[in-house]
Amino acid sequence: MTNTSTPPHLNWRDSFQVKSFRYQWPADLATSWAFEMETILLGWYILSTSGSVLMLVVYGSLQYLGSLLSPVFGVVCDRMGYRRMLWSTRAIYALLAFGIMLLSYFEALTPERVLILAAIVGIIRPSDQMMRNALIARTLPAAQLMGALGISRMTSESARIAGALAGAGIVAVLGMTSAYAVVTLLYVISFWLSRGVDDVQPSPNATALASPLQDLKSAFTYVWHKPILMGAMAVAFLVNLLAFPFALGLLPYAAKNIFLTNQTGLGFLGASFAFGGLLASLTLSSHKFKLRASQTMIIASAAWFALDLVFAFTSNLYMGMLVLMLAGFVQSLCMTPLAAVMLRATDPAFHGRVMGMRMLAIWGLPIGLLASGPLVESIGYVATAWVYSALGLILTLAIALYWRNALWDKHSVANNAL
């Protein structure tokens, strides 16, 4: 799994020499903090007020409703530029968060209204990460790409820690209204900073193609005929379908019913997963370990499913935090190389569209969540983990075998050192 070659010019600090990135980085950080706080706040609110695990997983699924539209967002961004799309969507986040704050203040907030607002946000939220990655790829020199991706991943994981802890702590001390005032403020800060991001000129191919539909068709054709991209997409869909549900949508259920803790304990569990991811991102960004990207992605995926199964058998809060930290570590060892593999295998003119295609894999998460709700209620949490983990391990092996020349061969471009 190691590689002795040393990639040139991979100093992550160089990214801050680019003005656009100096604005984008804190804007993305504020957005990530708000996302994480919002997920914890509303997930706990729905579970506490409705007592329904099914409603909880419906809420989790609605957050990814727009993943099917991500390729369309990619086409629009390639044609119109990314700055306008970035600050426009973040203005919408701020307005909707302000609406939830007002509903809470006037004691008019209900689980049903939360689900409606979550559906609206869910139409555009999945494309936020696509816009971040594509914007980094198009505004920074190619030599700085991996360093910038490492920074982006580290800030995302640190935001998960801060969001999980702050979200739970603020609502416990100040209540829902004050907590959502903080969320709204973070979105406003993100909107303001996003205005400083440099405009990206539309792709030269945008004017050559006759219609956006042809742009979209070309993206599907491009990915379909690249085994590296197809294999990476398969891994992304698989971990969203069978691994992420236990660290995201089902975590409030585990906190309340398995670990018998409150929202503060839930925050610590979520922060543990994120802390593991942060440690892995720091490890990858240090460039001290020359790992073959695609092989690392496959092995980390298998380890993630195994740790999900161990977590299901854990009832002690501190042991659960440790297992989640390890799961977060291998999660980052899977997802960061996955992004690197896809960006390296993609021509620059297709970055927006291919990253939009990549976000389609997120659709695995709502499917996995919706399937897990009835399973947990009928066969129990542990048995559900058994089913998901066993399927995950089997399908990971199948992916590695089917695309072995593209993903496992040490001479493949997918296995260039990280």
Question: Where do the model's predicted regions map?
Answer:
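Substrate-agnostic recognition of the 12-TM MFS/MFS-like secondary transporter fold
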Residues: 23-39, 62-75, 81-96, 113-172, ...
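Juxtamembrane transmembrane-helix termini
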Residues: 106, 110-113, 141, 199-203, ...
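Residue-level signal for alpha-helical transmembrane segments in multi-pass membrane proteins
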Residues: 41, 45, 70, 99-103, ...
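Flexible cytoplasmic inter-helical loops of multi-pass small-molecule transporters
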Residues: 2-9, 195-221, 409-416
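Membrane-interface helix-capping segments at transmembrane helix termini in multi-pass transporters
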Residues: 47-57, 98-123, 143, 147, ...
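Hydrophobic alpha-helical transmembrane segments
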Residues: 111-122, 147-203, 271, 275, ...
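Helix-loop boundary and gating motifs at the non-cytosolic
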Residues: 7-65, 221, 225-271
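C-terminal transmembrane bundle of multi-pass solute transporters/carriers
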Residues: 57-59, 72, 79, 83-95, ...
